[in-house]
Structure formats: structure tokens, C-alpha cells
Amino acid sequence: MNKDQTLSHTTGRVSFKELQQIIKMGLVQGNLIPAFAGAWLAIVMTNHSFLSSIPQILLMLVGSTLIMGGACALNNYYDQDIDRIMPSKQSRPTVNDRISDRNLLMLSFGMMLIGEACLFLLNIPSGVLGLIGIVGYVSYYSIWSKRHTTWNTVVGSFPGAVPPLIGWVAIDGSLSLAAVALFLVVFCWQPIHFYALAIKRSDEYALANIPMLPSVKGFKRTRVSMFIWLVLLLPLPFLLSNLGVTFVVIATLLNLGWLALGFTTFRKESNQTKWATQMFVYSLNYLVVFFALVVVVSLIKMI
């Protein structure tokens, strides 16, 4: 594409659908679930009034959405070179020149600044955790680890697990064991989720020279890593034992179900894409069900 063609593309307005791609709205929405659960659990466990906490919850959700969307937009800016190589990324506005670099950076930093302002309005810990999430995702994951080490997914899991901490401190102002437990659940969940996706796109990552674990170490090694993270999930519901035996039992069954699904096709080497797809779909359902369970059980306790 020549310069004139590029200008003609970037001077048009970006559609709402394209904006969603730029800020990775699906990823943002997924992270808002544990953020809300963290806030809700803080209300229940620290005896805050729900009605008086609604403004904090809303401001936390707005701030979290903005900082995550802004960080994702900056990630898209930095990843333009590799996204142009990967077939699954060809519809991104950053790849087909639907948005200029200048506008993309303005959008990214504008969202992050406003988002951080919202979080700091809540309290200092919320703003600081937001900054940790931004720096961790943009610097340590996007710029450094993603292109240099097979540990990139684990590195990215740390900032990716910050939302429930922000949710909690937005209400209570300080962390607790329950907040850390939610953080650990998201932290351990992410490698399983993203390794499953990486198995499905292993050839693409290899083509773009991104050292994802399946592309570098192969399917067997990746699958073993996924099982390790699944095992690490098993004791985490017990850290939330204050929610009661029912919660611990259901959450443990949810973990065991995922482990059982993983073992069903463990030996079928030729079926690796189907296996990865099943694990990926379960991971999506797991995130929603686990945190919905946190909210529902704590609501029952509050009533």
C-alpha cells in the first residue's frame, strides 16, 4: 500500500466494531468479571453497604475498562509488525491502516490517563495497582517477554490478574487473603487459557517468530505445563473457605472437571487441535462460572 492509499484509509472514521478490535474489548470484558467479583466480595466480607458502594463500583469499572483498553491499544500499536504476518490478525484496523499511529497513540494514552484518574479518585491503592497492571502488560509482557522468552504467557499472567485486586481495594482500600486468592485464580487460569489458544495458532506464532511455548517446545511440553497450572488451581478454593463448604465443593468440582477433560484425550497426539479447542472453551466457561459462583454464594451469605 502506497502513502496516498494509506492516507485515504486513515482519514476515515473508525467504526465501533473496529474500535472494539483496537482496544480488545473481548479481553477487557473478560477481565471486568473478576474485577466486579473482587469488589462484590469486598463489600460482603468487610460489611460495606452495597447501595453506598455503587458509585465506587461504577467508577472502578469505568477506570478499569479505560486502562485495560488503552493498554491493549498500545499493545496493538507495538505489535503491528508481527500482526501483519499472522493470518488471524488481518482484520485488525492497525494492520489494514484504518487508524493512523498518531490517532492510535492518542487514543491509547488518553484512555489510560482518564482511567488512572478514575482509579486514583477512588483511592491511592487502586491507582497504583492500575499503574502496575499497565506497566506489567505493556513493558514486561508486550515489549519484552512476548518476543524473547517462552515464559511470556506466565509474565503476562501477572498484570492480567490485577483486576480483582483493583476491585477489592476500590471498596476496602487494602488487600486481604480473599483478594489474593482471586488474584491467584486468575493468574493460574491464564496460562491454561492462552496455551490452549497458542496450540491452535502454533503455526502462526512460529511464522511471526513469537516464542510461544507450543511453537518452541512442542505440544507435549505445552500440555504438561497446562496440567501443572491446573493442579495449582486445585487448592485455591480453600483460600476462600469463608464463603462456605458449598462454594469450596462446587469450585473444586469445577477444577476437577477441567482436569478430567484434559486427561480424556491426553494420549491422542493427532487430535491436539480439537483437544486445545475443548480446553479453550472450558477456560472461557470456567472464568464466568467461578466468579459468578463467588458473587452468588457471597450474596446468599449477605442475605
Curated annotation (Swiss-Prot):
It is a multi-pass membrane protein. It catalyses: heme b + (2E,6E)-farnesyl diphosphate + H2O = Fe(II)-heme o + diphosphate. The keyword Protein transport does not apply. It is an enzyme of class 2 (transferase). Interacts with CtaA. NCBIfam families: cyoE_ctaB. This is Protoheme IX farnesyltransferase.
